[in-house]
Structures are given as C-alpha cells and as structure tokens.
Design a protein with these regions (language model features):
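Acidic, PIN/NYN-like endoribonuclease modules and their adjacent C-terminal/linker elements
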Residues: 2-26, 55, 102, 129-166
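Short beta-strand scaffold positions
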Residues: 29, 64-65, 103, 123-126, ...
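A short acidic, often aromatic-flanked loop/helix-cap motif at beta-alpha or helix-coil junctions
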Residues: 71, 108-109, 162-166
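Phosphate- and divalent-cation-binding pockets in alpha/beta enzyme and binding domains
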Residues: 72, 111, 148-149
Length: 166
C-alpha cells in the first residue's frame, strides 16, 4: 500500500517526493513536545515548543508523529480536570488537521522493539525513533532520558531545549 498517513481525518497516500526529495524540512515530534502546545502549567521550553507550533501554518515544514501520539496526549490530559472535554475534542481535531499522523506498520513496530531493547527505553519511545528513522527526519523530544539514550543513533534526536530552526 506504500506510505500513508491520516490527514484531516482521511487516509492519504504520501507521494515519494513528499517524503524523500522535498526541500521542505521534516520533523517527527513526540508527545512530550506536543503536550506543551496545549498545557503550559509547570512546563519548560515553552518558547521552543511554540516555534514548532507556529510551523503548523508554514509550507516550509512538515510535522509528523505516530498515531501513538494521540493516545499519549489523551492519556496525559486524563488527569487534568481543568481541561474540559470540548477542549480535548478541539485538540484532537487540530492534531489530525495539522500534523501528519502516521499509522504504525509492522516495520515500525519491529524497529521500535529493537530500539527499545537495545537502548533500554520504552517500546513507546522506540516507536518515535523508528518513525524518525523511516522518514529520515529528526525526532524532537523534551524527554531528557530518551534524548540521553538515543543521541548517538545515526538518525538525529534533538532535545527541545536545543532546537533551532536554522
């Protein structure tokens, strides 16, 4: 079936030029970064997260995340009772409209497991690394442990605090 993504709540086939040969900058984001877009209380590096949020309206950047991101964001908000259900609905809609949400396939799952076992990280974190590798796009994270354990991988992992759009 080739490379596909869910965008605007519809499955689309991603043309190879969009993934491989585009001059557009591509990034994979994990939930630790995206969460900061919607919840500011006791969070750090909000300015850097806001830069990435502003990329949503840019034609120069493509932001990707595995479908796992939606589950992690919803789970993080589960205990934030001050965030009303209507707000959660709009967050989910915005994420599907603005980020290319990539369905995890067998290849990503297999690669994620290898990374999880090799780096001693969660399988969930391994999914972000595997997607980053598959798309040949840097992974941006605010997770210090993930960064520390994955920074020496051949594909780039960028700590949010170190992110620069240059």
């Amino acid at each position: 079936m080739g490379k596909t993504a869910v965008f605007n709540e519809e499955r689309i086939k991603l043309p190879d030029f969009l993934i491989g040969e585009s001059k557009v900058r591509k990034y994979v984001l994990d939930a630790s970064v995206v969460f900061k877009w919607y919840y500011k209380k006791n969070e750090v590096d909000l300015c850097k997260a806001d830069i990435l949020y502003n990329f949503l309206d840019s034609k120069e950047y493509l932001l990707f995340a595995p479908d796992l991101l939606i589950y992690e964001i919803l789970n993080a908000f589960r205990l934030k009772e001050e965030i009303k259900n209507e707000i959660i609905d709009s967050i989910v809609s915005e994420l599907y409209d603005a980020i290319f949400i990539i369905e995890t396939d067998k290849g990503i799952l297999r690669d994620a497991f290898v990374h999880a076992r090799t780096l001693n990280i969660s399988f969930y974190d391994g999914i972000y690394i595997a997607l980053s590798k598959k798309l040949d796009a840097p992974l941006i994270t605010a997770d210090k442990k993930l960064y520390r354990l994955g920074k020496d991988l051949p594909h780039r992992i960028i700590m949010l605090s170190d992110f620069s759009e240059k």
